[in-house]
Structures are given as C-alpha cells and as structure tokens.
Regions:
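Regulatory nucleotide-sensing modules
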Residues: 139, 144, 153-160
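Ligand-binding loop in jelly-roll beta-barrel domains
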Residues: 28, 79, 90-114, 181, ...
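A short, N-terminal "cap"/entry segment at the start of jelly-roll beta-barrel domains
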Residues: 1-39, 99-144, 148, 222
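The feature marks the first
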Residues: 28-32, 36-74
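Glycine- and acidic-residue-biased ligand/ion/polar-headgroup-sensing regions
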Residues: 51, 60-75, 163-178, 184
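Histidine-centered metal-chelating micro-motifs
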Residues: 53-56, 74, 86-95, 157-158, ...
Length: 222
C-alpha cells in the first residue's frame, strides 16, 4: 500500500476529518498519513487505543517513535502521559496498550537501522525561552534528522529553511501555511527544498516538527 508516498510533493492532511481504520488488533484504530508497505510499512499515522485495548508483543525491527496526544499510553516499561515523546530504536520491543484509552502520533521504520538510542521526554519540560514569539525544544538530533517541539504565540511568524524536507503536526491552535489553515491534528509535509513559511492564528499554535529526513524515505528492508 502506498499513501502520500511521493516525497517530492507537498502534502496536507487534516487528520481530524480522516476516518478511523481498524487495525488487526481489536480496539486499535488508525488514521494513516503516509505509508509505504502493508502491515510491515514505513508509516506515519495517528493511532487510537480504546480503553482496555492492547497490541500484541512486538519488536521494532525498523524503529518506532511516537508522541502521546491524548490519554496515557502504557507498556511494560511504564506509563506515558500526553506530551511524552518516545524513541524506541531498532531491536527494542514492548507490549503496548492503554487501560483508559489514548491517542498517539507514531512513525515506524524511519530510523537509521544502526541507531540504538532509546529515550522518553516530556516535551514541555524541554522548552527554551521565547524569542520573537516562538519557544522551541529540540527533542532529537542525528545525522539524518532533527525533531522539535515548537510553541508559537498568537500571530508569530515561523520560517524554516531546513534542507531535506519538513514535516509538521499541529498539536493545538491554528497555523496558516500557504493557502491552508492548519488546525489541531493537521499534518503538513514539505518536500526537500521547500521552505516553511507559516503564521500562528489568534490562539497561537503548538507543533511537532521534523526536518531533514525525507531523502532517507524508503520501504522497509524486510
């Protein structure tokens, strides 16, 4: 299955308007944003766990990163409340679930296969000082990509010139980019060479952002 798999094109998905699609596990549904592959896939999705649902134990052959959007995500290693960013590199494993239900933004098979750095962060706790109406937290950096949490005050202008492409998920508030008004859970992907030039709405905006990574996009090596 290929979905938004041409990484040379600009893509906007208003995920709040996308229907949920049932996963193979009962009680776990997905909104797919981009995908190369079937059940083993390089994938970007929003995933919803119903209360009491769980996924079977599995190993992250290609790595997994996620941000908890709502509720509390759980596995045998602990609880991950909303606002937690997690990187589970290749070879890690767990049995995920959510006793009270949760929603996460998750990316699969998008790691350097030699990466072994595993961590979790409270994104709010990482924020730096406000400059020109914008506060930033760098969540992860390596030779392939930079992952950030960005908070914009009302009307703040955000410009990113990062090579290698840009990807943004709006977590709260609104963001104007080109002719599009991005709202909560709107997802934007800009191809390599296209700058991000956006302005926060009247309530400001909170964003998850990744830059530099699109040249490495490929189907899982299985």
């Amino acid at each position: 299955m290929d979905l938004n798999a041409d990484f040379t094109k600009r893509v906007v998905v208003h995920a709040g308007d996308v229907p949920w699609i049932a996963s193979p596990m009962p009680g776990v549904d997905r909104r797919m944003l981009d995908r190369i592959g079937d059940e083993v896939a390089r994938a970007t999705s929003i995933v919803r766990y119903a209360p009491g649902s769980a996924f079977s134990a599995h190993t992250h052959t290609g790595g997994e990163e996620f941000l908890v959007l709502e509720g509390v995500f759980q596995d045998e290693h602990g609880d991950y409340p909303a606002g937690t960013y997690v990187r589970n590199p290749p070879t890690t494993s767990h049995t995920p679930g959510a006793a009270e239900g949760c929603t996460i933004f998750v990316k699969l098979w998008q790691f350097d296969l030699e990466d072994r750095t595993q961590f979790r962060l409270d994104v709010e706790a990482q924020l730096g000082p406000v400059q020109d109406g914008i506060a930033r937290a760098e969540l992860h950096r390596d030779a392939r990509e930079v992952v950030s949490y960005v908070v914009l005050e009302p009307g703040a202008a955000l410009t990113e010139l990062a090579p290698g492409g840009i990807e943004v998920l709006v977590l709260e508030g609104t963001l104007r980019e080109g002719a599009d008004d991005l709202v909560r859970w709107s997802w934007l992907r800009l191809p390599e060479g296209t700058p991000l030039q956006a302005t926060a709405g009247s309530a400001g905006a909170r964003l998850w952002m990744k830059t530099g990574h699109l040249p490495f996009a490929q189907a899982p090596l299985v």
